[in-house]
């Protein structure tokens, strides 16, 4: 994403400027879909589309051709249903929770049934309504998180009447180690999935997440289910990231100062200035999704220059050592880059000792948000939308 934001541009009272490139999002979707042209390609938009705004993201993906969307909770599904065309199918990964049957049926929400109990609930509701209801059925192929156990699958295979009133859209599972192409679990889960699918003849299979798409044709099946790769995150630990960056984060400077040698910086005085040091305090901290684990190890960037974090990350602010820049380069209102061309999601996640998913979904609501629409110039987008 070639986003040119003036380094003297104030953030309009916000802690910083979060820019979301919807054109790159669309391109990532089309790239992933193009890897398996015989398959459909869904989009995982749970957690407010990984923190980027499910309403805007989902509409962009729908316009790109996506017709299947996955969220985690029923409330996410209901909110999305109000914004998307009736042509879109919305799946709830956490399944059918007690009391949600009426809402799912009335709003055409498709639960992912993860247990015999959930299957019984949905079947009973179908009988009560006197109509067939759609669902996906998830199989636990080795992650031990959600889905029918081998014992439950055996019972279901022997008692197909348990599915009375249910039309199965997909039988599905989730890969635990797809981002590690050589992990033995991938082939093991594939074998279990293939065997499990025989209990549902003629039913389409949904198996591949972002990493799974890159494991090859054996993993593609009827429906792909990417998440992090849509948003520019690396789908695999093997090789360079093939996805376009979707997010850029620039944070405003709120004060600069020069401190003498021996000064203790930040909470606990965990950084000591060994020489006279120029510092800049920026207006974002761990409340804004920049983890405390970045203390004394992470950095911001300015025009290709790394600016190390000096001391501990605070709730609302971070102190940077800006001694590498000419004096006067940064002033109040200047913007430094936290995520962008010089520092990817994976870079900042590595410094924080976490994963790109956690960084992305943790970005707070205090940033000024701008969306670059497909075909829109960055200069126009930088002042076009403020999503809070």
UniProtKB/Swiss-Prot annotation:
SMART domains tied to this protein: Ala_racemase_C (SM01005)
PROSITE patterns: ALANINE_RACEMASE
UniProt GO MF annotations: alanine racemase activity; pyridoxal phosphate binding
Keyword Isomerase recorded: yes
Coiled-coil stretches: none
Origin: domain of life: Bacteria
Keywords (A to Z) from UniProt: Isomerase, Pyridoxal phosphate
GO cellular component, one term: cytosol
SUPFAM superfamilies linked to this entry: Alanine racemase C-terminal domain-like, PLP-binding barrel
Pfam families cross-referenced by the UniProt entry: Ala_racemase_C, Ala_racemase_N
Catalytic activity of the protein: L-alanine = D-alanine
Keyword Hydrolase among UniProt keywords: no
N6-(pyridoxal phosphate)lysine PTM positions: 46
Cofactor: pyridoxal 5'-phosphate
Record-annotated active site: 46, 267
Binding-site residues for substrate, renumbered to this chain: 145, 315
Listed GO biological process terms: D-alanine biosynthetic process
Gene3D superfamilies per the UniProt record, alphabetical: Alanine racemase, Lyase, Ornithine Decarboxylase, Chain A, domain 1
EC annotation from Swiss-Prot or TrEMBL: 5.1.1.1
Transmembrane segments: none
Disulfide bond sites: none
Recorded family membership: Belongs to the alanine racemase family.
Entry function: Isomerizes L-alanine to D-alanine which is then oxidized to pyruvate by DadA.
Protein name (record): Alanine racemase, catabolic
Organism listed in the record: Agrobacterium fabrum (strain C58 / ATCC 33970)
Gene (UniProt): dadB
């Amino acid at each position: 994403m070639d986003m040119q934001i003036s380094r003297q541009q104030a953030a309009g009272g916000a802690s910083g400027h979060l820019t979301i490139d919807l054109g790159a999002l669309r391109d990532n979707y089309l790239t992933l879909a193009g890897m398996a042209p015989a398959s459909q390609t869904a989009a995982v938009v749970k957690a407010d589309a990984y923190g980027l705004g499910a309403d805007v993201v989902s509409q962009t993906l729908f316009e790109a051709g996506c017709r299947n969307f996955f969220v985690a909770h029923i409330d996410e599904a209901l909110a999305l249903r109000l914004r998307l065309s009736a042509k879109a199918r919305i799946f709830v990964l956490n399944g059918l929770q007690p009391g949600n049957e009426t809402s799912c049926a009335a709003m055409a929400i498709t639960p992912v049934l993860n247990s015999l109990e959930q299957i019984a609930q949905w079947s009973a509701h179908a009988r009560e309504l006197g109509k067939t209801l759609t669902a996906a059925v998830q199989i636990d192929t080795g992650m031990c998180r959600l889905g029918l156990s081998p014992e439950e699958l055996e019972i279901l295979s022997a008692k197909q009447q348990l599915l009375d009133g249910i039309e199965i859209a997909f039988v599905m599972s989730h890969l635990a180690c797809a981002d590690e192409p050589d992990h033995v679990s991938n082939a093991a889960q594939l074998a279990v999935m293939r065997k499990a699918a025989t209990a549902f003849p003629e039913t389409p299979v949904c198996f591949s997440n972002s990493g799974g798409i890159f494991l090859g044709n054996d993993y593609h099946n009827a429906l792909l289910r990417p998440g992090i790769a849509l948003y520019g995150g690396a789908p695999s630990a093997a090789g360079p990231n093939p996805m376009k960056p979707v997010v850029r984060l620039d944070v405003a400077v709120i004060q600069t100062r020069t401190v003498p040698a021996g000064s203790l910086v930040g909470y606990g005085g965990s950084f000591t200035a060994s020489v006279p040091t120029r510092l800049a305090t920026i207006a974002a901290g761990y409340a804004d999704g920049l983890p405390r684990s970045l203390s004394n190890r992470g950095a911001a960037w300015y025009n290709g220059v790394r600016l190390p974090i000096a001391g501990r990350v605070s709730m609302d602010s971070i102190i940077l050592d800006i001694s590498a820049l000419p004096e006067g380069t940064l002033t109040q209102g200047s913007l430094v880059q936290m995520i962008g061309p010089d520092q990817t999601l994976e870079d900042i996640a590595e410094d924080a000792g976490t994963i790109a998913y956690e960084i992305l979904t943790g970005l707070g609501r205090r940033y000024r948000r701008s969306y670059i629409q497909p075909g829109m110039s960055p200069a126009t987008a930088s002042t076009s939308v403020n999503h809070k």
